[in-house]
Amino acid sequence: MIEKDMPEVSLLDMALMIEQELDELDMAKVEAELAQLSAQLEDYLAGSSSEFGGNKGQPWQGVLDCFYQQWQFTGDWQQFFDYQNTQVSQGILNRKGTPLTLGVLLVHFLRQSGLTAHGICFPGHFLVRLDIDETFHYIDPFNGASLSWQQMELKLRGAKGDLARLKQQDLKPDDIKSIIKRLLHTKKGALLRDHQFNQALRCSDILLRLAPGDPFEVRDRGFIFHELDCFNVAVDDFNYFIDKCPNDPSIGLLKLKIEQMDHSQTVMH
């Protein structure tokens, strides 16, 4: 069970476990590519790789150079919202993705190299923090660029509005569970845009296994059931949310949808 294994596995392993459940992932192919990349990185950092040549910089700079220059991992602007770009496994095979999928991979390779790296679920983006000699370095995994405070604040304002100001709490590292939930929400959003409601429902079910009874997850599952014309369970989910969060701004919309579904069921009978 994913939720039981979470304390014992790495971020990358957990992401791949979820994709194996959602997408019937060919793990042998992915693991073979991952093992090859790991071996290449070890050789590159040791300066003994005939393919890459030596590296005399700092280890973390070597990892970034190998990741972005040698392997040519890159952010996919053109198909940013495609479901494939939410798949870490496809990132390994195709060497492109979103800030989140590339960030999961970058954290993995940095940690594999003995470095202290963390993922940050930044508003509208995903960042990687490197801890070097009691100094924090922030990396944009979409392109490997180091980010200044001003650059990160611009990203924050792009996500939250021009009045937003960057605070230290915005840069706190997130745990595996938080990052996996962000990944699942991203997957679910891509599937909903593609009208893949059954697979989106599977994402929702995993999210509720990670946060049992969470009213917002239950409400969102209700919207998916509504799209699938499963009105009885959609009504149950909406009523659960209304009971748990009676002052939420979405209550009016939910009550309207419940009335519409009740009417539809009456007409069908």
Model-derived features: where do they sit?
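A structural boundary/capping signal
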Residues: M1-H269
